[in-house]
């Protein structure tokens, strides 16, 4: 079967759109009137209330604050969501703090609240509506598609892909925020987001556990030029309950990255395990990309597809973290079992204590680990060492750090600190530069 709509073209329910193992249920997209795609324009001049613009009525665009000399960023929500939800306009507001931009929140709640199998077909109409608006801007107002960036969450990521594909990949950038897995993973490129949909495609994966049995809603498949897997792509810190917490974190990371880009450096790495074992450190000579809003500043961004990056984030607030590699060489009287902790004292502030090692503590041995610190301490001036025993014993041995080496992930700078002190457990020892 096939259904056609005036300015949007025709839609079929033949393969690969339906009747495949990934898409067993055959259905056509709903009527565009029912889906009722709306474009809510926010700009630096109207940050708190939107102007409704319509592709079929160019007068609405000309009468609005849409500025032809600025970039345009579309934000597209996902399943069961709405374009008037606060997270979309909040993202625009963060952008207005760092740039002048046309920020268009795309509302398709008339199509997103259907059953999932139907909603996944409805995005084809929404993608066509977005593409049509970009075409109108291009043909009627001479506005170049490469100035367009489409950000989509969940089903919205594949909606962005559909729009980009219809514009022959001429859109400047697409960002996929945890693209939806069911009905899209392992499907042909024309059905889902893929790197050919824009000049640059970057993706943040936060919920890659399988849909069955874990209810992981996001794709594990790499679908961009650059695919970021914060915290390995699943089980986000601070997400205790609720099936949507991990899936929604991709939005929160992007939102924070607009104002805190340096706190989301992605390390190129083959796997999260390798990253966690202190591999893939420090950043390469050309630097690490910034996950989120400023990923497009990375020099090698489109050198290859499926470039893979890992990082760890915080559990709340702005989620930023700064990664360091720490090596502690111990001195002391005997080898109790316990843990050793280090804090960094820098020009911009002091970090909390981070555990470097837990186990048998042997004098003269060295222990190395990577830590993700909650603030950018700047140039490191001192470090503190603290050890704690596990278990109880009558004797009170003393241990110390004779040397602590700290390396910054961002630029590879190494700092060396020394001391000849030894301290009892729970007593802080300060080390100065050697």
Curated annotation (Swiss-Prot):
Annotated metabolic or biological route of this protein: Glycerolipid metabolism; triacylglycerol degradation; Glycolipid metabolism
Disulfide partners: 4-10, 92-103, 239-245, 269-280, 283-288, 418-434
EC number: 3.1.1.26, 3.1.1.3
GO cellular component: extracellular space; neuron projection; zymogen granule membrane
CDD domains, A to Z: Pancreat_lipase_like
Catalytic activity: a triacylglycerol + H2O = a diacylglycerol + a fatty acid + H(+); a 1,2-diacyl-3-O-(beta-D-galactosyl)-sn-glycerol + 2 H2O = 3-beta-D-galactosyl-sn-glycerol + 2 a fatty acid + 2 H(+); 1,2,3-tri-(9Z-octadecenoyl)-glycerol + H2O = di-(9Z)-octadecenoylglycerol + (9Z)-octadecenoate + H(+); di-(9Z)-octadecenoylglycerol + H2O = (9Z-octadecenoyl)-glycerol + (9Z)-octadecenoate + H(+)
Molecular-function annotations in GO: calcium ion binding; galactolipase activity; lipoprotein lipase activity; monoacylglycerol lipase activity; phospholipase activity; triacylglycerol lipase activity
Name under which the protein is recorded: Pancreatic lipase-related protein 2
Source organism: Cavia porcellus (Guinea pig)
